[in-house]
């Protein structure tokens, strides 16, 4: 009954594609089709393929989504400090490939805090014909004295630093690891009405 959309979340399978692994591309598409059919039947409003480290696996999930569902799809990869995915894909290549396959929004999530994500967003924006997503962590993770992972960026700082991503060209905004309701509320306060918080 509210204004929020419910997204069906899809991520990495943990399996490697041949020749490095034992799964071929068509099998991977079938794995994603099964998940997407269930999410579609459950009534989600859109699909989010996120925290992807491999462009190949992201392609498989997007192809599967387009074959078995008419729902909008957001595709989001994680990038290392060198602005490449773990498998070596740069942001411009990711954007060009995924928008050509029919993604409705392409971007980046997890990986870093807001300030370190700007380079990825800028590169994507250079070739984007669709909206760009930026969904960073609340800073970089650290281990506390008890060995637990903590994120130290407070909500107010997160909101301020998200302005940098807006300036870099992000249209869809959100928070990943370490973010709380307070972080998202801070983000809503800095966002223009034309931007979507996800």
Residue ranges of each PLM-predicted region?
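Non-cysteine beta-strand/loop elements that form the S-adenosyl-L-methionine
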Residues: 7-10, 74-76, 130-138
